Amino acid sequence: MKAKDIRKKSQEELQKELVELKAELFKLRFQHATNQLENPMKLRDVKKSIARIKTVLRERELKGIEV
């Protein structure tokens, strides 16, 4: 997910997306540990998406904006 798309979403949508991505990351880590993960790059992509969402949420917190 691109940062531009993330910035268009509301606070609640971002919180929901963050929870979903964290759950997906948990599943992927478990699959990776048991050697069932076909594409290890998926781990990196999910981690980066989580970081992007957290960054946007923090920016909004500092600005005091709730879009």
UniProtKB/Swiss-Prot annotation:
One GO MF term attached to the UniProt entry: structural constituent of ribosome
Originating gene: rpmC
Alphabetized PANTHER family for the sequence: 60S RIBOSOMAL PROTEIN L35/50S RIBOSOMAL PROTEIN L29 (PTHR10916), LARGE RIBOSOMAL SUBUNIT PROTEIN UL29C (PTHR10916:SF0)
Keywords: Ribonucleoprotein, Ribosomal protein
The protein, known as: Large ribosomal subunit protein uL29
Keyword match rRNA-binding: no
Record-linked PROSITE patterns: RIBOSOMAL_L29
NCBIfam families in the record: L29
InterPro entries: Ribosomal_protein_uL29 (IPR050063), Ribosomal_uL29 (IPR001854), Ribosomal_uL29_CS (IPR018254), Ribosomal_uL29_sf (IPR036049)
GO annotation terms (biological process): translation
Source species taxonomy: Bacteria, Bacillati, Bacillota, Clostridia, Eubacteriales
HAMAP family in alphabetical order: Ribosomal_uL29
CDD domains: Ribosomal_L29_HIP (cd00427)
Family: Belongs to the universal ribosomal protein uL29 family.
GO cellular component: cytosolic large ribosomal subunit
Organism: Acetivibrio thermocellus (strain ATCC 27405 / DSM 1237 / JCM 9322 / NBRC 103400 / NCIMB 10682 / NRRL B-4536 / VPI 7372) (Clostridium thermocellum)
Pfam family, one: Ribosomal_L29
